[in-house]
Amino acid sequence: MIRISSRRMCRLILSIVSFLMFGVHAAQASETNIRVTDLAERTVILSHPAKRIILGESRYLFALSILNPDHPLDNIVGMLADLQSIDPGTYQQYQQRFPEIDDIPRVGHTSADSFSVEKVLSLNADLAIFGVEGHGPGARNAQLIDQLERAGVTVLFIDFRNDPLVNTVKSMRLLGHVLGQNTRADAFVEYYQAQLDRVVKPLAIAMAKHPQHSPAVFLHSRVGLQDLCCETMARGMMAAFLDNVGGQNIAKERVPGSAGILNLEYLLTEQPDIYIATAIGAAQNLEADAANQPPYIVLGAGVSRSDAQASFQRAIKESALGSLTAVRNGHAYAIWHHFYNTPLNIAAVQVFAKWLYPQTFADLDPHATLETLYQRFQPVPLNGTYWVELDTKAGRS
């Protein structure tokens, strides 16, 4: 019979208890891990909600603001400079309410090539939020992703660009999980889906009762960016909005990828029923020397309707697109380009629905939808013009 002293027995018991407690804590830690599948179909695991975040595109501030509208910048330790460069109107709104936005380190400019892994690693980040595709690092940047994850920076992929009307909801739920903001994410998703239903359901009913002609649409992307006529979107981005509302995108059969060029001769031959331009100009363009500015259409934060209309008139005049039947017949419109890369895209979908089927959607009010999105889910007020119809009478005066 083996005898164990009381002192050794106490030590043994303490050791066993410590071992068991370690096992309990390990199990609890495992159970509390955040585990999701991102939109690049990768398993992403965090031990706790992210506290030090890198934004692969600073335009994702729209999404993060939905989850934390009072303090959207609190956990951002670095970001690309695209918002300030590409959408200065919105950046200025954030700057006015949150001056500290200027102090957030920039980890690149407006491209994946400019993204600095070294800078990110110096910021002790625990999560990097990237788009599957876009201006920042994407799912194809395998070496960069590997570098970050080897250094302890978890990478999460979201998407508002490739398949926006499917992946906006998925992306917001993912962000809600990894940031510990599920309640806010669920509230947004509920509103988003309700507003999408206001397009999808009436359109399905109308088509079933009275099959309608599907309008042929030319989507003219980033008007004024280059002299060559005319850049367009064929798949994903705003082309997905057209698909959702039953528009016939004339670029689909001619452009093999997501975006490309349709020349003016083709447009004059095809003569689309509707012309929609995307506007990359901002209020800041109006402050510069207008004579030396490209013919951008100006929309977005801080832009008046009259300035938007004047810029649209100029763009049409300088591009020779005034000869399109859609323009002459009063079916020419422009919309804020950056809807394609934010969860606020549902307002643009509703706008497209009204432009294509004005009778079916006579009671739909996209501006009210956008107002609600800003009031409930954004930290800055809705202040600007985000879409406009070309005033053909003004063009003839």
Regions found by a protein language model. Give the residues of each.
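A general, composition-driven signal for non-globular sequence regions
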Residues: 1-5, 19-22, 266
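Bacterial N-terminal signal peptides that target proteins for export
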Residues: 2-14
